[in-house]
């Protein structure tokens, strides 16, 4: 089994893709948290997971943050 926070290249999203993605809830900017493999929307207070290099931009899949 792979550790939840590995440094495999496939665990991070394509930087070009990250430049154009916005939060689907607020349409605001996202910040990459490479250590957690998440895209953070500060305005929506949500963290979207990146799985196998693919950002999962579904609000129901996002983790709530404070």
Swiss-Prot record:
Family named by the database record: Belongs to the UPF0434 family.
Read off the HAMAP family from this record: UPF0434
Looking at the UniProt record for this protein, which Gene Ontology cellular component terms does it annotate, in alphabetical order? Answer: cytosol
The record lists the organism as Nitrobacter winogradskyi (strain ATCC 25391 / DSM 10237 / CIP 104748 / NCIMB 11846 / Nb-255)
Signal peptide coordinates? none
Pfam families, per the entry: Trm112p
Protein name, UniProt field: UPF0434 protein Nwi_0075
